[in-house]
Amino acid sequence: MAKKPDTSSRIADNKKAAYNYFFEERYEAGLVLHGWEVKALREGKVQLTDGYVIIKDGELFLIGCQINPLKTASTHVSPDAARIKKLLMHKDEIRRLIGKVEQKGYTLVPLNLHWKDGRAKCEIALAKGKAEHDKRDTIKEREGKREVERVMKSRHR
């Protein structure tokens, strides 16, 4: 049987999250969006860098995610770029997250936005904040990898 083509594609990544947090678990959540937001996502007018997820009354909300409206947005709708977006997940997953987030030091951060079967999805992670020395270790590790790649590249020439 033929394999179905991969219809998912990345809209935006939160690269700063990997620098600031250790990821424990990853989850995928749906997004409740307005029409102008979907159009802006298709154009890639989104910023996740300062985003975070809160749990309020047993529901998940994405805060700090900027979806900038297109210049051609409708005139009868006043778009709010910093609007709080509701995330959709199963109740049992949300209950599990509530228990883990209540532990000291854990938070929920958005990792990326992507399309899956024509719908916008947000990948979120249960994360623990890195200390300053951990961030320095991450930088050293990244620079070490770059140096190895540079040496290997020069050897192959």
From Swiss-Prot:
SUPFAM superfamilies with a match to the protein in the record: Small protein B (SmpB)
GO molecular function: RNA binding
Start and end residues of each stretch annotated as Disordered: 130-157
Disulfide cysteine pairs (residue numbers): none
GO annotation terms (biological process): trans-translation
GO CC aspect terms: cytosol
Pfam families in alphabetical order: SmpB (PF01668)
Compartments reported by the entry: Cytoplasm
Family: Belongs to the SmpB family.
Name of the molecule in the record: SsrA-binding protein
Taxonomic lineage from the root: Bacteria, Pseudomonadati, Pseudomonadota, Betaproteobacteria, Burkholderiales
Gene name tied to this protein: smpB
